């Protein structure tokens, strides 16, 4: 790995990483400058020390929350994807987390991008990414966004209604279309997509005919089984349904479909392993006769979730008997909005930099039933209840792992707490 070149926003830190790995330098001794961005090479178990160095060196006065993005984790996840689904091109769902350094390394490692709005397209293009690496994967778009896509050359989009056909015919007739279908089984996902998007079986032929009458090219089919812990078996039925759409288009005399978009719903770990097996099996069963088929996907949380760690400061404390109540400087109106909108469960680890510097993780310490509140004035802003934590003090820190998916991207500035201002620090942790 030491000889591999990693590009981050035009940065090539390979030589500096080599000096750390091969030259015996301390984990934080080498940094690659790129404007105001640095990439710190680390061993896998040095991330905690890196966060402590940020806290002690940079945040003495203003103890603001911050993220650490582990680019090594991103590279590992991309390698896992290529190994498990080598014939499926990932189009990363920008809405999940648009951190620019994150997008840059995804791009450098070969990922393309799923954008849902003009703003997301503009953002991706601003990083120097070609428009032919973007799918405009929003089945219902404002006309102004369609006009913009035509102007900049984003020529692949999704639809699931006749009105969308009319808008595209009027403003972007050169665009190729993917018919978004609704899977009959959403996989019991935390965030199902079916109630809002996707053509029903009886709507497929009329929608194909509408595009045909408008002289638009329908290049293929897309679907999304839903986001977060979805049952991988949902891919089986969805891919079978997609094959039926291909066959219907052929019966209508339409041009041969060449693209299948299997959507998102992938989560790193065991779920991804089982999902990859299901997808490969279904593709072999239904599309083995089309070796020229281009297969794409729209993973978001698979790449983002485990790559980001959030560090927050304890700004307030209250003791009520055995109960410990802490206030931190991020919450449900900020990064932890995922608890409400993504139905996520967050976990906290202490960094007792003030009260227990010799044992910052408080290993072996007595724990107490704990409530953790966010900083806003809304009582809804409660991050954790009935959680076990050791005794902590104001200006100690709580660290939240796996905070890359639908966190900062969906945060607000409610009560003046500016989620968009939270800084992301870059590290590259090599496998142990």
UniProtKB/Swiss-Prot annotation:
One of its GO terms (cellular component) is chloroplast. The keyword Hydrolase does not apply. Keywords: Alkaloid metabolism, Chloroplast, Lyase, Plastid, Pyridoxal phosphate, Transit peptide. Disruption phenotype: Reduced alkaloids and nicotin levels associated with a lower putrescine production. Occasionally, an early senescence and a lower viability of the older leaves is observed. Coiled coil: none annotated. Pyridoxal 5'-phosphate binds at residues 227, 265, 298-301, 406. GO terms for biological process: alkaloid metabolic process; nicotine biosynthetic process; polyamine biosynthetic process; putrescine biosynthetic process from arginine, via ornithine; response to wounding; tyramine biosynthetic process. One of its GO terms (molecular function) is ornithine decarboxylase activity. Gene3D superfamilies: Alanine racemase, Lyase, Ornithine Decarboxylase, Chain A, domain 1. The keyword Transit peptide applies. SUPFAM superfamilies: Alanine racemase C-terminal domain-like, PLP-binding barrel. Homodimer. Only the dimer is catalytically active, as the active sites are constructed of residues from both monomers. Belongs to the Orn/Lys/Arg decarboxylase class-II family. This is Ornithine decarboxylase 1A, chloroplastic. It comes from Nicotiana tabacum. The gene is ODC1A.
């Amino acid at each position: 790995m030491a000889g591999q070149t990693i590009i981050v926003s035009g940065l090539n830190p390979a030589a500096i990483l080599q000096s750390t790995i091969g030259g015996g330098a301390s984990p934080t001794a080498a940094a690659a400058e790129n404007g105001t961005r640095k990439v710190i090479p680390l061993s896998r178990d040095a991330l905690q020390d890196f966060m402590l160095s940020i806290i002690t060196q940079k945040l003495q006065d203003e103890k603001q929350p911050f993220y650490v993005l582990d680019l090594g984790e991103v590279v590992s996840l991309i390698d896992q994807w290529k190994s498990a689904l080598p014939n499926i091109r990932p189009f990363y769902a920008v809405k999940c987390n648009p951190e620019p350094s994150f997008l840059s390394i995804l791009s450098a490692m070969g990922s393309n991008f799923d954008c849902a709005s003009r703003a997301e397209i503009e953002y991706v293009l601003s990083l120097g990414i070609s428009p032919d690496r973007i799918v405009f994967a929003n089945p219902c778009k404002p006309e102004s966004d369609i006009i913009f896509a035509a102007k900049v050359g984003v020529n692949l989009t999704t639809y699931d209604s006749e009105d969308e056909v009319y808008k595209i015919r009027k403003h972007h007739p050169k665009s190729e279309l993917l018919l978004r279908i609704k899977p009959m089984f959403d996989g019991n996902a935390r965030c199902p997509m079916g109630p809002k998007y996707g053509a029903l079986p009886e709507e497929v032929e009329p929608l194909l005919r509408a595009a045909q009458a408008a002289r638009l090219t329908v290049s293929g089919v897309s679907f999304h089984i839903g986001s977060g812990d979805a049952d991988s078996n949902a891919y089986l039925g969805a891919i079978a349904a997609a094959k039926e759409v291909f066959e219907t288009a052929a019966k209508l005399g339409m041009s041969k479909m060449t693209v299948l978009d299997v959507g998102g719903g992938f989560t790193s770990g065991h779920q991804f392993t089982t999902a990859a097996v299901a997808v490969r099996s279904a593709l072999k069963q239904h599309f083995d006769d089309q070796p020229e088929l281009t297969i794409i996907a729209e993973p978001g949380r698979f790449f983002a979730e485990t790559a980001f760690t959030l560090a927050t400061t304890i700004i307030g404390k209250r003791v009520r008997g055995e109960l410990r109540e802490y206030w931190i400087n991020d919450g449900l109106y900020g990064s932890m909005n995922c608890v409400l909108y993504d139905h996520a469960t967050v976990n906290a680890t202490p960094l007792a930099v003030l009260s227990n510097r010799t044992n910052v993780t408080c290993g072996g310490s007595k724990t107490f039933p704990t409530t953790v509140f966010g900083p806003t004035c809304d009582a809804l802003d409660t991050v954790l209840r009935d959680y076990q934590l050791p005794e902590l003090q104001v200006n100690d820190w709580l660290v939240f792992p796996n905070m890359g998916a639908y966190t900062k991207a969906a945060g607000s500035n409610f009560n003046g707490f500016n989620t968009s201002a939270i800084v992301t620090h870059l590290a590259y942790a090599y496998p142990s």
